[in-house]
Structure formats: structure tokens, C-alpha cells
Amino acid sequence: MGTKVKIGIIGGSGLDDSQIIENRTERVVNTHFGIPSDVLIEGKIAGVECVLLARHGRNHSIMPTNVNYRANIWALKTLGCTHVLVSTATGSLRDEIHPGDIVIPDNFIDRTTKRVQTFYDGNELLVGVCHIPMEPAFCSRTRDVLIETARELGIAGVHNSGTVVTIEGPRFSSKAESNLFRQWGAHLVNMTLVPEVVLAKEAGLCYAAIAMATDYDCWRETGEDVNVADVLATFKKNVTKVTELIINAIPKIAALDWTETIEELAKTVNTSIMLPHSN
């Protein structure tokens, strides 16, 4: 008998519809790191235990900088999640990634400036300093399931890899920044993937993201610079693809034995912690 799977789902802009979960119950969770963005909704998708959390709150009232990423991830861990699937709206930095396309990212570049990126900050709950390695940045096996599920569903415009630049926000990039990110080899830009992906790894959770390209940011010379109205319209038009992918991937994830993967992840975390020593 393998490890029992329980999947946390962090919904970004447009994907905070709790109706995708059956037999839903709301849980208020307070963590050592504060209160999560919203109540957590527990239930089942395709018979698999899941927990849904709206990253920005159900009323989208929390800007990216102010999201309590630590509380969100720790709350999912507290409720017994083994995996975290997230959706995120992104700007495309590549001609071949069109608005409405989906990317399953495999790497990131951090351009945030105001966010705590570790649980090991000197608190009494977790002792030491954690130098977590971020290669691979995302759970490879979980990504593989998402990619295979998208292929089986015949979802158009799916890209199997990509590097996401996470900026502080809430402002969008300048044209100079957007072109710099392109020179760095990045494919997408967003505001929420970091520190979420880092904290999930520290917590020993199998984390993968579904990134929806909603615009071309502002690097192109053809005048279609990013704006809120276009972002929301594109995400709303295409969010059913993200929902369909998540709903169909969940039972495939649950059908696999994750014991070794989770044990290896726990080992990585444990061997990354430097404990204080006495002189």
C-alpha cells in the first residue's frame, strides 16, 4: 500500500471556484506562520481527497506581495496534503506562447524583493537554517502527469516546459524589464510563483504549476501591451482548460505510488538543514 495522496489546489486569478469539489466542507486553519488567504475547502475530486485555497482570497482582495505564502503552504501541509497543484496567470515572453496557451513550467527566476522564502527563520517550531536546493524546482513526476493528461485530453496550445520570472508586483513590467527577461531566456512572467514553489519544497510537498499565458507582457512592438482587462478576459475565456486538466490529472496522480518520491523529498529537506551548534 503506497502513501495516501491528498492534493492541495491553490487557485489563482479565475480558478477559485469551489464548486469543483464534491462534499465540500470549510476549514478555518491558523498556522504558526499566520492565517492563510482564506478558509480552506476540503472535499473530493474524482474520489480523491483535495483541499482548495484561493491564493488572493475569494474576493481577490490580497495583492501578490501581501499573500501569506507561508501560511498557505503550511495550512495545506497541516491538513495532510502530499501534493500541491496551482494555477497562475502569466505574461508570455515568447512569440510561440500565445495568449490562452498553457505552460507546465520547470524552472523559475526570482525577481521578488519583499517576501519571506523560508519556514526556517529562527522560530521555535523549525530549528536551523534550510538551504533547500531548487533543482529540480518543481516535482518532475507531478509535472509528467499534467503533461500526459493534457496530451490525452487533446488540449491545444500546451507547452511542456518553461522558465517563469516572478516579479514583485503589483505593477506590470517595464518594456526594458520585459526585454531583459527575454534575454535571460525566460518564457513567462508572473507575480506569485515565488516563494510558493520554494516553500512547498521546504514543506516536503510535491508541487507543480499550470501557467496560463494571458498576454504578451509589453516587449512586442505591435502595441498589445498588458492590461488588467485583457488578462482577466483571456483567463476567463480559457480557464475551463485549466480546470479540466486539474480534474483529470488528480485521479492519475492518486493512482501512482508516491512513497519513494515523498521519502526522497523529505530526505532532501532534512539534509538541507544546518542546525545550530555550541562552541
Swiss-Prot record:
What GO terms are given for molecular function? Answer: S-methyl-5-thioadenosine phosphorylase activity
| Binding residues for phosphate | S13, R55, H56, T88, A89, T192
| Marked site: Important for substrate specificity | S173, V228
Q: Which UniProt keywords apply?
A: Cytoplasm, Glycosyltransferase, Nucleus, Purine salvage, Transferase
Where is this gene product found?
Cytoplasm; Nucleus
- Residues the record lists as binding substrate: M191, D215, Y216, D217
Give the main location. cytoplasm
State the top-level EC class.
transferase
Q: Which InterPro entries does the UniProt entry name for this protein? A: MTAP (IPR010044), Nucleoside_phosphorylase_d (IPR000845), Nucleoside_phosphorylase_sf (IPR035994), Purine_phosphorylase-2_CS (IPR018099)
Q: Catalyzes what?
A: S-methyl-5'-thioadenosine + phosphate = 5-(methylsulfanyl)-alpha-D-ribose 1-phosphate + adenine
Q: Its domain of life?
A: Eukaryota
Question: Annotated pathway, please?
Answer: Amino-acid biosynthesis; L-methionine biosynthesis via salvage pathway; S-methyl-5-thio-alpha-D-ribose 1-phosphate from S-methyl-5'-thioadenosine (phosphorylase route): step 1/1
Pfam families in alphabetical order? PNP_UDP_1
Biological processes, Gene Ontology terms:
L-methionine salvage from methylthioadenosine; purine ribonucleoside salvage
Family classification: Belongs to the PNP/MTAP phosphorylase family. MTAP subfamily.
Q: What does this protein do?
A: Catalyzes the reversible phosphorylation of S-methyl-5'-thioadenosine (MTA) to adenine and 5-methylthioribose-1-phosphate. Involved in the breakdown of MTA, a major by-product of polyamine biosynthesis. Responsible for the first step in the methionine salvage pathway after MTA has been generated from S-adenosylmethionine. Has broad substrate specificity with 6-aminopurine nucleosides as preferred substrates.
- How is the subunit organization of this protein annotated in UniProt? Homotrimer.
**Protein name in the entry:** S-methyl-5'-thioadenosine phosphorylase
Species the sequence originates in: Anopheles darlingi
